[in-house]
Amino acid sequence: MEVKAIHKSARISAQKTRLVADQIRGLPIARALNILNFSPKKAAFIVKKVVESAMANAEHNKGADIDELKVSTIIVDKGTSLKRFTARAKGRGNQIEKQTCHITVTLSN
């Protein structure tokens, strides 16, 4: 049995989120949540919410036992960039891209 949870357009770059995702891929749920709880990174908080959402989906929709689940796959894809401008000298402006990403977590037995 596989259960998914997806967070689209998370306001953090995919590169930073992949660092956290690589730490919990393939781990049991309890160990993955423990690692995410004690990680100081902003991405850890966002990934933890997606993992908890997948757990709730498994319990509510499939009636699964949470203790048996593990993080089978976690995929972080690049999302759309928010384009902003910052003021520069002599009346010019430079473009800044604020990165987003899509996080997909799949839990299985």
Curated annotation (Swiss-Prot):
PROSITE patterns, per database record: RIBOSOMAL_L22 (PS00464)
Annotated GO biological process: translation
Gene Ontology CC terms, in alphabetical order: cytosolic large ribosomal subunit
Keywords tagged on the record: Ribonucleoprotein, Ribosomal protein, RNA-binding, rRNA-binding
Signal peptide: none
ATP-binding listed as a keyword: no
Gene Ontology terms for molecular function: rRNA binding; structural constituent of ribosome
HAMAP family in alphabetical order: Ribosomal_uL22_B (MF_01331_B)
Protein name: Large ribosomal subunit protein uL22
Classification lineage: Bacteria, Pseudomonadati, Pseudomonadota, Betaproteobacteria, Burkholderiales
